[in-house]
Amino acid sequence: SVPNEEVQQIAQQLTGQGVSRQALGLATRVLDVDARLPDPRILEVHPELSFQRMAGEVLPSKKSARGVARRISSLAQAMTDVDVVAALETCPADVPIDDSLDAFATLWTARRHADGRSEGILASPEIDSRGTAMQMTV
């Protein structure tokens, strides 16, 4: 692990800007997952791709009321065994709605994978040096 001060100094030299706390936290988690690969239980999922597959189209911005409504509707139709609205009401108040919806979309993809219905978005994904397919799953 590289100390925060060193990361900030290198980023400042290379880009003229520092690195956000969020980016540093995310990088730590990505490196942790990368160290565990290859592990067939770990999938690469992008919530927007999951929502696109659920809805059959690209949805409006997740930062807009229309986009939030469409995501809730898509989740409710795709996961009929879950009361999505009731589940969202149990989320901590400080968690942004778009983060909660993204977590649900990731859950939808994980369930599809567990049921053998998930699919990669690329016909021929690149394979990394460890033999892991570089592939988003929906």
Predicted features along the sequence, with ranges:
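RNase H-like (RuvC/DEDD) metal-dependent nuclease/polynucleotide-processing core
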Residues: S1-V138
